[in-house]
UniProtKB/Swiss-Prot annotation:
Source organism (scientific name): Ruegeria pomeroyi (strain ATCC 700808 / DSM 15171 / DSS-3)
Protein encoded by which gene: folD2
Oligomeric and partner information: Homodimer.
Any matching Pfam family: THF_DHG_CYH_C
Pathway(s) this gene product operates in, as recorded in its UniProt entry: One-carbon metabolism; tetrahydrofolate interconversion
Stated name of the protein: Bifunctional protein FolD 2
Gene Ontology molecular functions: methenyltetrahydrofolate cyclohydrolase activity; methylenetetrahydrofolate dehydrogenase (NADP+) activity
Catalyzed chemical reaction(s): (6R)-5,10-methylene-5,6,7,8-tetrahydrofolate + NADP(+) = (6R)-5,10-methenyltetrahydrofolate + NADPH; (6R)-5,10-methenyltetrahydrofolate + H2O = (6R)-10-formyltetrahydrofolate + H(+)
GO biological process entries: L-histidine biosynthetic process; methionine biosynthetic process; purine nucleotide biosynthetic process; tetrahydrofolate interconversion
Length: 292
């Protein structure tokens, strides 16, 4: 049953609070837990904001957080060597690779270098592949956050008609696979889809992750549908740039049954999922005999 008071808006704050409470309780129960290591390659201000948010949330639930800033000139080989050392370090619970990275760095190769049991972001190819087999224990954080918010509506996933607008490896494809694992019927729209609206107008749930401000309008949404807006865009405002999603929120909320705000929706839950993945990593590492 939904805990949301306003059925038009589906904020991330209560979901985030619940997940972080569960993480905190687990950390208190086990007593001692390894650290999360955040890797930033080069000094990117936007990345620094994400790292601060992650560090603050980790501190609040008692998970040690090590922020590492590597020089942007570091080589691919040195990066992979350092990651392998972390894989072998029992004091490292999980590894977070911040993006973007410099052009000379192959981000996929670094994601693949992170051991699946320390892949708290869920971006190792093995972690992505596990979703196909309905194993979503370490799913990509943003995708898992979107699923968590759909659950918050109280709707049963089984048989739900869902349209996923966007098919990125980080969000769109994992969301689609995770929803299929839950029994939903999923249609994925992308840049070659002839008409997004033709599909979205019949959907019970529309999830949007494209990176185009105000792409989805009220004429594209079925009355009463759930709209999960994952987009983050910066557009000019009267007092400077403002953050908006891929959905025309004010107009669409008059049609939709539930809609996530931007900011304050999926993004808030994403960091909580990262920390939930951390305790799942701890459970899996303990089951594998890595830690006691």
């Amino acid at each position: 049953m939904s805990t949301v008071a306003d059925t038009r808006l589906l904020p991330g704050k209560p979901v985030r609070a619940r997940i972080l409470s569960e993480v905190s309780a687990y950390v208190n129960q086990v007593g001692r837990i390894g650290k999360l290591v955040s890797i930033s390659i080069g000094n990117v201000p936007e990345v620094a904001v994400y790292v601060r948010n992650q560090a603050r949330a980790a501190s609040a639930v008692g998970v040690p957080f090590d922020q590492q800033l590597w020089d942007r000139s570091i080589s691919q080989e040195v990066c992979q060597s350092l990651i392998r050392e972390m894989n072998d370090d029992p004091d490292v619970l999980g590894i977070i690779l911040q993006r973007p990275v410099p052009d000379h760095i192959n981000v996929r190769a670094l994601q693949a270098a992170i051991h699946p049991l320390k892949d708290v972001e869920g971006m190792n190819p093995a972690s992505i592949g596990n979703i196909v087999y309905n194993d979503v224990a370490m799913a990509p954080c943003t995708a898992a956050a979107a699923i968590e918010l759909i659950r918050e509506t109280g709707l049963s996933m089984a048989g739900l008609e869902v349209v996923m607008v966007g098919h990125s490896e980080i969000v769109g494809k994992p969301v689609a696979m995770m929803l299929m694992a839950e029994g939903a019927t999923v249609t994925v729209c992308h840049h070659m889809t002839r008409s997004d609206a033709m599909h979205s107008r019949r959907a019970d749930v529309v999830v949007v992750a494209v990176g185009k401000a105000h792409l989805i309008g009220p004429d594209m949404i079925k009355p009463g549908a759930v709209v999960i807006d994952i987009g983050i865009n910066h557009v000019p405002g009267p007092d400077g740039p403002v953050v908006v999603g891929d959905v025309q929120t004010d107009a669409v909320k008059d049609v939709a049954g539930w809609i996530t705000p931007v900011p304050g929706g999926v993004g808030l839950v994403t960091v909580a999922i990262l920390l939930r993945n951390a305790i799942r990593a701890h459970q899996q590492q303990r089951a594998a005999g890595w830690i006691h």
